[in-house]
Amino acid sequence: MSGYGQQGVSAANIDSIRPKKRLSIGVVGSGNWGTAIAKICGENARAHGHHFRSKVRMWVFEEEIEYKGEKRKLTEVFNEAHENVKYLPGIECPPNVIAVPDVREVARRADILVFVVPHQFIERVCDQMVGLIRPGAVGISCIKGVAVSKEGVRLYSEVISEKLGIYCGVLSGANVANEVAREQFCETTIGFNPPNEVDIPREQIAAVFDRPYFSVVSVDDVAGVALGGALKNVVAMAVGFADGLEWGGNTKAAIMRRGLLEMQKFATTFFDSDPRTMVEQSCGIADLVTSCLGGRNNRCAEAFVKTGKSLETLEKELLGGQLLQGAATSKDVHEFLLTKDMVKDFPLFTAVYNISYEDMDPKDLIIVLQPLKEDSENEGGTETE
Amino acid sequence: MSGYGQQGVSAANIDSIRPKKRLSIGVVGSGNWGTAIAKICGENARAHGHHFRSKVRMWVFEEEIEYKGEKRKLTEVFNEAHENVKYLPGIECPPNVIAVPDVREVARRADILVFVVPHQFIERVCDQMVGLIRPGAVGISCIKGVAVSKEGVRLYSEVISEKLGIYCGVLSGANVANEVAREQFCETTIGFNPPNEVDIPREQIAAVFDRPYFSVVSVDDVAGVALGGALKNVVAMAVGFADGLEWGGNTKAAIMRRGLLEMQKFATTFFDSDPRTMVEQSCGIADLVTSCLGGRNNRCAEAFVKTGKSLETLEKELLGGQLLQGAATSKDVHEFLLTKDMVKDFPLFTAVYNISYEDMDPKDLIIVLQPLKEDSENEGGTETE
Ligand SMILES: O=C(CO)COP(=O)(O)O
């Protein structure tokens, strides 16, 4: 069955692989995660010159910024200073990363398109790229979350794939943009399992991202990788409620374990996910652990219990307008589970929804952790020997 | 393959199972974990009167203590006050738990023998019990750690089994004695997979321990359960070194993931362990998470980096003379791996040994986290497009 290193391939031996052609990398997005990813792509484009063309185009939504006392265009400043002074200040990107204000140029020139935009923009951005994509191009989505609609749960890689008619994989892991940008070691997971007609080997995709400080494992399981980054936020909220109640470390470990198993169950029940992905890869267990130790969802959920303020208020106070992903995802998941009549099969996800949106008492999380019993317990039975 | 709840059985429906006979429970040990376990056994003996005889005998190593200004015997005080005033003060045990100063009486009267003594005493305690065991009796070892000798790695359940000629399972999980004693919710794992001639179903064994606040999953994989509790200490030290170096959350999550996979690999390579146990059950992932968040090994390893003091000094200062399990286990494991010529297959375990006993720099843990490369990286290749 599974074992250490048995699932997945790394980019470790990329230089012994002879590629069919040198590929161009384009990055769609330039927020703090987008810029950190573009920096990595730029480093690898230079490091693996027989695999990649050096120039990495990064689409930047053009803005006027104040730079050294002057009003300047963000792309111009980036291309001069090799620094995204607005969204990733203090981090130097290699000079082969070029900021491009027109996403259509990125679309036209890339064989590998890396998507790192906030999920609410992805459809509109793709609309502008339609018809411009190179033959044989593929996408990699670094967008965490899932798109839920009446038709069900869709991965953003699926959204991109449908819009642009290309194969799209996923990258997700225990990766905080600023830590990655500062080259603090972390791991990540790529899900990439293209149909036969796609001519780019998975090692080459891994080599776009793998750095000495950013260790990539590439697996076939696209759905597992995408769902890990979405669902872990729900579990991080459950652990946050436990933090708020000052429950012990063992109780929190139990919530994490049960949450991880619900993540795995969700991915294997509704998608064709490999059960090992969630429990063994960075996109599952490791991302969950990081998020449960003081990530955004965790902190908001803790404050929810401790302060009695509403989640909307805390979202404003603690996240500066960012969406509290875990709560929103618990709602999406809940509505989806209702349509499948499977609410009771995901008691922890359901509890997070009920605490966040209904008036379930966080203390009742304990009840959720009990195994289902068919009978109530026969407390105080025979007492003689 | 695996999925939520698919590995293992719980005691949830114990009251619908009709047992062949009522069994007697004996607890060998009465330290703080031993007493917490005896409390649980006592509660379950009363709750499931058709499964168990009410009286639970707990072997107490007799000592004179000072109690309410008088010199008294520890067993007498326990049987009067239903409290282990020396090792688990402030916690009331049910009155059907009886302290017994003679381990032979416990041996003679129990069908289920629960072992909770410090590992260094287990052989001598068993020696006193030889020849007194009831026909059909089984053991459950709650002793964390492994016994390493020239012949290899042995589980304490194997030691007990050989000494007493009984089948012996294992209980281990994310369980801190004081939290369990105070009935803070946690989960645990039992490994119990007896040969056919043993007539006690695994649900009945699970029911000895399962409480509303102590949730048991019973699996077949005895080795995985036993090894989880031993090997997680090694990984907790690695995370402690990272804490000492003030590495980020993602780096620590990567160390935990890699450590968990080494635990799984060790258990599946040298024992017949199910790979799911380590990554899905409380005895693996959950116990590891708790231990990495400020457990003893974690704190000592952090202090080792921050203070520059030796581990022996820190053992004295921080653990009051208790053995630093993680360091000792890393040494045992290292010596065992040398005999198998497999040191390089367990780079994280090996690094913990080398940092603890040789003079490896903790910072070089990063190197260990890199995937093995066959070639050095072709940094600075072609740069033109
Ligand atoms: O995605 C992240 C880590 O990988 C960020 O975590 P939070 O959203 O929990 O802050």
UniProtKB/Swiss-Prot annotation, chains A, B:
Tree of life domain: Eukaryota
- Where do the coiled-coil regions begin and end? none
User: Where, per UniProt, does this protein localize?
Assistant: Cytoplasm
Where NAD(+) binds, per the record, is at: G29, S30, G31, N32, W33, G34, F121, K144, A177, R296, Q325
Q: Which residues form the active site?
A: K232 (proton acceptor)
What GO MF annotations does this protein's record show? glycerol-3-phosphate dehydrogenase (NAD+) activity; NAD binding; protein homodimerization activity
> Binding positions for substrate?
K144, R296, N297
Using the record's annotations, give every residue carrying the modification Phosphoserine.
Answer: S376
Judged by the first EC level, this protein's enzyme class is oxidoreductase
Q: Name one Pfam family in it.
A: NAD_Gly3P_dh_C
Q: What InterPro entries does the database record attribute to this sequence?
A: 6-PGluconate_DH-like_C_sf, 6PGD_dom2, G3P_DH_NAD-dep, G3P_DH_NAD-dep_C, G3P_DH_NAD-dep_euk, G3P_DH_NAD-dep_N, NAD(P)-bd_dom_sf
User: What GO CC terms are in its UniProt record?
Assistant: cytosol; nucleus
Q: Which residues are modified to Phosphothreonine?
A: T382
Oxidoreductase keyword on record = yes
Keyword Magnesium included in the entry's annotation = no
Assigned keywords, A-Z: Cytoplasm, NAD, Oxidoreductase, Phosphoprotein
Q: Name one GO biological process term.
A: glycerol-3-phosphate metabolic process
Please write the reaction equations for the catalytic activity of this protein: sn-glycerol 3-phosphate + NAD(+) = dihydroxyacetone phosphate + NADH + H(+)
Q: Per the UniProt record, which EC number(s) apply here?
A: 1.1.1.8
Identify its protein family. Answer: Belongs to the NAD-dependent glycerol-3-phosphate dehydrogenase family.
Protein known as: Glycerol-3-phosphate dehydrogenase [NAD(+)] 1
Protein source organism: Schizosaccharomyces pombe (strain 972 / ATCC 24843)
